[in-house]
Amino acid sequence: RSLARFRGHAVIAPGNHDFYAASSPYARLLWPENVHIFTSGRPVCVDEPELGCAVWGAAFTAAEEADGSALTAVRCPDDGRTHLMVLHADLSAPDSRYRPITPAQIGETGLSYLALGHTHAFSGVLHAGRTTFAYPGCPEGRGFDELGEKGFLFGEVGPDGADMAFVPFARRHYQI
């Protein structure tokens, strides 16, 4: 219901803990028209002409996605539009079981901004080629395995890149 009241567009890229399957809430629930859920393990582009942008995404369709080619099909033309992507992926290890990707692969996409999920810690705002990318982390730590400042990213994204800033949000802070 909250997403139905939201006046914008929402996109969801299911990850390894909430992967897309016929039995998942993503498939079984009725979602508002302003919500797009990526259901394919391969990147898909959703055109948003009224917003002047294209939004890419891919879903986990199993608890593990070890294929490291998630970004090879993503090549954004220099067409004056903003090209965004939401992706649950792992930058930390080339042999990861959780959709391994590299900064070099990110740089080849031509995306304006890549919003990453998987790591629950803010990565800093990073750049590869013309693409800005980041893990925002999680808005609220859940235990002593999620230490440090938690929050979200806020900013502006356009055809030439993104200007993002971390906004602290958590009410609780876990520290050792």
Predicted regions and their residues:
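His/Asp/Glu-rich metal-coordinating catalytic cores
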Residues: 1-134, 138-151, 156
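C-terminal functional module detector
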Residues: 144-176
